[in-house]
A protein has these predicted regions:
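ABC ATPase C-loop
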Residues: 147-148
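Helical segment within the ABC ATPase nucleotide-binding domain
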Residues: 170-184
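The feature captures the beta-strand-to-loop junction immediately N-terminal to the Walker
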Residues: 31-36
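Helix-to-loop junction immediately C-terminal to a conserved catalytic motif
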Residues: 49
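Conserved ABC transporter NBD signature motif
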Residues: 57-65, 77, 111
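ABC-type ATPase nucleotide-binding domains, specifically the catalytic core motifs of the NBD
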Residues: 13, 94-111, 119-121, 214-216, ...
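Conserved catalytic motifs of ABC-family nucleotide-binding domains
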Residues: 151
Length: 233
């Protein structure tokens, strides 16, 4: 088991958001978390990466208790994070953005420059272009590449389809499958786009009001109508 959350709660100030979350992710899996806006998906991802402290419970990564570890320590341990909204550095070039991701694993022989340009060739073509001038889909590719270049064991993606045209969403979903298949990278993502959930996830947790209410397996993931019920579509 590469990632475990046991009875994890978290929030902002005195406002609780996550309540007694239990999650299991095996190495090499692609696991989704689905739910409508406002159910706590982004809070979950910030808590997993360490940008937000868990107020209760335990987070275990690769067999180690990382509950008290900060985001930088978790990143060095092998977590890569792609936040909602991508958060690329708009005034820096594509290449400079990617080099920022390299600092997590500076000096390593395991950096994945060749691989990221294979997955996202448009980034190599536009290496000198300011990141802020890229399209939304290209910025998402850049955010993934920046997280991937340090060769993390786990990628955490927060709403990877948000604000991106459908054809590019499909392309990014295929790229994430290739990354998982070829590199063995474990992926945990949160999403409310049914197409992305069905395309990517091996299994999925359904989230409501800050906690998981069900685990969805392959049979339900293949049934679009059944899956839509979890999002009240």
């Amino acid at each position: 088991m590469i990632l475990e959350l046991d009875d994890v709660s978290a929030g902002y100030g005195t406002t609780p958001i996550l309540r007694d979350v239990n999650l299991r992710v095996e190495a090499g899996e692609i696991v989704g978390v689905m739910g409508k806006n406002g159910v706590g998906k982004t809070t979950l991802m910030k808590t997993v990466i360490g940008l937000l402290d868990a107020t209760e419970g335990t987070i275990t990564y690769a067999g180690e208790d990382v509950t008290a570890a900060g985001a930088d320590e978790r990143a060095r341990a092998g977590m890569g994070y792609i936040p909602q909204g991508r958060e690329v550095f708009p005034k820096l070039s594509v290449e400079q953005n990617i080099k920022i991701g390299e600092t997590v694993n500076a000096g390593s022989d395991d950096l994945l420059y060749d691989e990221i340009y294979d997955y996202f060739p448009i980034l190599q073509e536009r290496a000198d272009q300011q990141a802020g001038t890229l399209s939304g889909g290209q910025q998402q590719m850049l955010a993934i590449a920046r997280a991937l270049v340090s060769n993390p064991d786990v990628l955490l993606l927060d709403e990877p389809s948000e604000g991106i045209q459908p054809s590019i969403v499909d392309q990014i979903s295929r790229d994430m499958k290739r990354i998982n298949d070829q590199l063995g990278t474990t992926i945990l993502f949160v999403e409310q786009n049914l197409g992305v959930i069905r395309e990517l996830a091996d299994r999925c947790y359904a989230m409501e009001r800050g906690t998981f209410v069900d685990t969805v397996g392959p049979e339900t993931l293949a049934d679009e109508d059944a899956l839509a019920e979890y999002l009240a579509v």
